[in-house]
């Protein structure tokens, strides 16, 4: 109790609403046809680059560790929980708290769905500390080419939450913010740069 008022967690509040909802209605069927592309891979690469990201197509058998080091030769501190990455000094699954990821030069994660329409990549939280997505100076996202879809409608039909964490986010290039004068600043609030590695 703080100030005489009890605090209610979001999930408790939503569960209380669900218990007290006596009449439910099915969602209406809406036939939405999203934009389609002849070449989703080409469109995805173009959109990713247009929003300030970089794209590297990994060659078969190429070392992902070496590929990341080549992309960021000045980086000293890498963070990843992916088993195929052996250069990481920090692991978001084993750090004591999110703050321990501070000072990460390059965070390395895996995306599950890429969207050709806008260059977004769906990244479900599969690690204990999701801060690696936002606290890293630069972010490397591995994405399988076969997981690129045309539009957000197709993407939402495919996304799944990890039941352990129940969180995910779409990321499209480096962080961006713009003021009322429409001056665009990249990297002010999260990753200063994003590299998508297509595997």
Show which residues each predicted segment covers.
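The feature marks the mature, well-folded catalytic cores of soluble enzymes
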Residues: 2-199
């Amino acid at each position: 109790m703080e100030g005489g008022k009890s605090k209610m967690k979001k999930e408790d509040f939503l569960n209380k609403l669900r218990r007290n909802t006596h009449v439910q209605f099915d969602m209406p069927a809406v036939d939405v046809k999203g934009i389609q592309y002849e070449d989703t891979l080409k469109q995805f690469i173009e959109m990713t680059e247009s929003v300030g990201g970089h794209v590297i197509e990994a060659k078969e058998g190429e070392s992902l560790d070496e590929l990341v080091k080549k992309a960021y030769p000045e980086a000293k501190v890498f963070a990843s929980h992916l088993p195929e990455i052996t250069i990481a000094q920090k692991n978001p699954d084993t750090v004591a708290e999110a703050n321990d990821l501070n000072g990460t030069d390059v965070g390395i994660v895996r995306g599950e769905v890429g969207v050709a329409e806008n260059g977004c990549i769906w990244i479900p939280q599969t690690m204990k500390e999701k801060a690696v997505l936002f606290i890293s100076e630069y972010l490397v996202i591995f994405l399988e080419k076969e997981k690129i879809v045309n539009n957000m409608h197709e993407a939402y039909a495919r996304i799944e939450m990890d039941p352990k964490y129940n969180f995910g986010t779409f990321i499209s290039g480096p962080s961006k913010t713009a003021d009322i004068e429409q001056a665009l600043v990249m990297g002010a609030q999260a990753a200063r740069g994003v590299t998508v590695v297509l595997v």
